[in-house]
Amino acid sequence: MVNVVLGSQWGDEGKGKLVDLLVGKYDIVARCAGGNNAGHTIVVNGVKYDFHMLPSGLVNPNCQNLLGNGVVIHVPSFFKELETLEAKGLKNARSRLFVSSRAHLVFDFHQVTDKLRELELSGRSKDGKNIGTTGKGIGPTYSTKASRSGLRVHHLVNDQPGAWEEFVARYKRLLETRRQRYGDFEYDFEAKLAEYKKLREQLKPFVVDSVVFMHNAIEAKKKILVEGANALMLDIDFGTYPYVTSSNTGIGGVLTGLGIPPRTIDEIYGVVKAYTTRVGEGPFPTEQLNENGEKLQTIGAEFGVTTGRKRRCGWLDLVVLKYSTLINGYTSLNITKLDVLDTFKEIPVGISYSIQGKKLDLFPEDLNILGKVEVEYKVLPGWDQDITKITKYEDLPENAKKYLKYIEDFVGVPVEWVGTGPARESMLHKEIK
């Protein structure tokens, strides 16, 4: 059994909380894309665990965890995150964590050039805007992967005669091409090389052939949960390009990032914030640059876990959700942070786009069009009631249930979970047929 948790908007929907809720039922949690450019917090027995790169299945002491071939790995950050989690009391994490030998490596110079590229782009653009990268080197790493010049985990840990010398030569060549492109930026090659010589020994026990790992697990009828990173609207192909990440963050990335066939997928859970947020630049049709947006930002505590940046806030965009559903094929939804809407008398939701009076059939791929669309809203009544202490779906206010029902009917997918507060237990389950 392979079930998948995916973000349906621009990230920060609360995927980690759903994974945390479900993880006790699974034998394996796997990540398939991205790196340490994402982030979420899980609270267990009052202890906060911040996850960026590592699978959040580590909070379950009986669960194995895999970073698949589609993930890009900054090895120093890998160990720093692991050590931070261990210092907070996470037990036997090292024996339950595995890394694909095919995963690509993020180096510090990728991070340096990530920031240089961002400055370059903001200088070129008419409005001074940039992509809004986290500066973690993710984009440049996927770029070297696509150009077939990148280095993978197996290049680093290979013990065969001459393998280390080959790694050094390729590492140096990769650095030189970056310097040719961005100038002679400061980078102590010898010091970094010495660091990686130590890290390779530390990394070796974690490395597996992830294709064999996954297919053995599937054959053994293991219960597997795939933890998506980022979200569909940040997908390199289907998101608001170029204001996207550099990997496939939808269902396609699950298949290619773990090396599994489509027929192995059972359930696909789409995580949806009850309103919409995004970090960084790019069109955002339902954004509220007013008191409503500020209220959503304040009540929702909308700051990025990885960057600390304030998130842009707006009403729920059902055009985005329908588009996301079309591509990812969600079998059920998790609506998160419904409690943030508790004090709104009326709650608009975006239901269609038009431009120059002409209604669009679907989410447009052209950002020049997307930036000019007019949004048609359906205004739904609020419930003006604190729902954070409610423990059963049936006890939600009628207007809250109507809000959820409207979402279900619009996208044609049932809501299975509803987030009603920041606590781990603040998640209501709704039976679906």
Swiss-Prot record:
Co-factor note (free text): Binds 1 Mg(2+) ion per subunit.
Family matches, as Gene3D superfamilies: Adenylosuccinate Synthetase, subunit A, domain 1, Adenylosuccinate Synthetase, subunit A, domain 2, Adenylosuccinate Synthetase, subunit A, domain 3
Pfam families assigned to the protein according to its UniProt record, in alphabetical order: Adenylsucc_synt
Taxonomic superkingdom: Eukaryota
Binding site residues for Mg(2+): D12, G39
Protein residues bound to GTP: 11-17, 39-41, 311, 337-339, 419-421
PROSITE patterns on file: ADENYLOSUCCIN_SYN_1, ADENYLOSUCCIN_SYN_2
Keyword Nucleotide-binding: yes
Residues that coordinate or bind substrate: V305, T306, T307, G308, R309, K310, R311
GO biological process: 'de novo' AMP biosynthetic process; IMP metabolic process
A Gene Ontology cellular-component term: cytoplasm
Enzyme class: ligase
Main location: cytoplasm
Swiss-Prot/TrEMBL catalytic activity: IMP + L-aspartate + GTP = N(6)-(1,2-dicarboxyethyl)-AMP + GDP + phosphate + 2 H(+)
Needed co-factor(s): Mg(2+)
Subunit structure: Homodimer.
Protein name: Adenylosuccinate synthetase
Record organism: Saccharomyces cerevisiae (strain YJM789) (Baker's yeast)
Lineage of the species this protein comes from: Eukaryota, Fungi, Dikarya, Ascomycota, Saccharomycotina
